[in-house]
């Protein structure tokens, strides 16, 4: 069931990809619609629920032509917090109050993950709603776009981690069993282990419970 909450999407594509040994955003991926790149695969998923979509890329990073707004990090290598703040600010300026923030290296992501989070994000007065399947998934959550000001303050204080952001604001966690759709691809072996999901398959997210539950850090 989809939520009526209008969402932007922020896809972080500018990571260093050290363990993969090459840019993960442009890594070929055999998806349900044929061979594509990782960034195009993730965009196809988030675009099913979110508009507009922003891709945060590294300076000079080569990307295919994308149906999204591409923004460049001003400095390379400062981590996801800076990129998240940039994307949230752009989403706020586009008139969206909330955005789904995603890593580029989750090719098994499905729209149903967004649905599971969007309902609680609409009902609860929380700043961040994250999936929790034994660990936090900071880069698969819904964030209030006004948090870009909090991100800026954290960066000014020398913080670089996403945990610093979620610990500083009201964060709700939605308890799920382990979700293959949330798997990150860091190595070639990780990629080989992922079976392409069917877009729109309702069983892609199973057993969501505990709406609004907070898990101790």
Curated annotation (Swiss-Prot):
Q: Where in the cell is it found?
A: Cytoplasm
Q: Which CDD domains match?
A: MobA (cd02503)
What residues bind Mg(2+), as annotated?
Answer: 105
Q: Residues that bind GTP, according to the entry?
A: 12-14, 24, 73, 105
Q: Which GO terms describe its molecular function?
A: GTP binding; metal ion binding; molybdenum cofactor guanylyltransferase activity
Q: Which UniProt keywords apply?
A: Cytoplasm, GTP-binding, Magnesium, Metal-binding, Molybdenum cofactor biosynthesis, Nucleotide-binding, Transferase
SUPFAM superfamilies on file? Nucleotide-diphospho-sugar transferases
One GO BP annotation here? Mo-molybdopterin cofactor biosynthetic process
- Pfam families of this UniProt entry? NTP_transf_3
Q: Is GTP-binding included in the keywords of this UniProt record? A: yes
Q: Does the keyword Transferase apply?
A: yes
Where is it predominantly found? cytoplasm
What's the cofactor? Mg(2+)
Q: Which GO terms describe its cellular component?
A: cytoplasm
Look up the EC number in the record and give it: 2.7.7.77
Tell me what reaction this enzyme catalyses: Mo-molybdopterin + GTP + H(+) = Mo-molybdopterin guanine dinucleotide + diphosphate
The UniProt function text for this chain reads: Transfers a GMP moiety from GTP to Mo-molybdopterin (Mo-MPT) cofactor (Moco or molybdenum cofactor) to form Mo-molybdopterin guanine dinucleotide (Mo-MGD) cofactor.
Family as reported in the entry's similarity comment: Belongs to the MobA family.
Domain remark text: The N-terminal domain determines nucleotide recognition and specific binding, while the C-terminal domain determines the specific binding to the target protein.
UniProt-recorded name of the protein: Probable molybdenum cofactor guanylyltransferase
What is the organism field in this record? Answer: Mycolicibacterium vanbaalenii (strain DSM 7251 / JCM 13017 / BCRC 16820 / KCTC 9966 / NRRL B-24157 / PYR-1)
Gene this protein is translated from: mobA
């Amino acid at each position: 069931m989809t939520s009526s909450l209008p969402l932007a999407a922020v896809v972080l594509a500018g990571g260093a990809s050290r363990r993969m040994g090459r840019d993960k955003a442009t890594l070929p991926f055999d998806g349900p619609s044929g061979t594509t790149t990782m960034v195009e695969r993730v965009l196809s998923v988030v675009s099913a629920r979110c508009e507009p979509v922003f891709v945060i890329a590294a300076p000079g990073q080569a990307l295919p032509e994308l149906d999204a707004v591409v923004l460049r990090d001003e400095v390379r290598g400062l981590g996801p917090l800076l990129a998240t703040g940039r994307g949230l600010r752009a989403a706020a300026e586009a008139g969206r109050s909330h955005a789904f923030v995603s890593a580029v290296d989750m090719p098994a992501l499905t729209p149903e993950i967004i649905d599971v989070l969007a309902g609680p994000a609409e009902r609860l007065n929380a700043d961040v709603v994250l999936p929790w399947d034994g660990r936090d998934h900071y880069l698969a959550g819904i964030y209030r776009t006004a948090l870009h000001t909090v991100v800026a303050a954290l960066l000014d204080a020398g913080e670089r981690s996403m945990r610093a952001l979620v610990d500083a604001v009201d964060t709700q966690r939605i308890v799920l069993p382990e979700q293959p759709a949330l798997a990150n691809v860091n190595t070639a072996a990780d990629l080989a282990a992922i079976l392409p999901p069917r877009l729109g398959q309702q069983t892609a997210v199973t057993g969501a419970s505990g709406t609004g539950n907070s898990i101790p850090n």
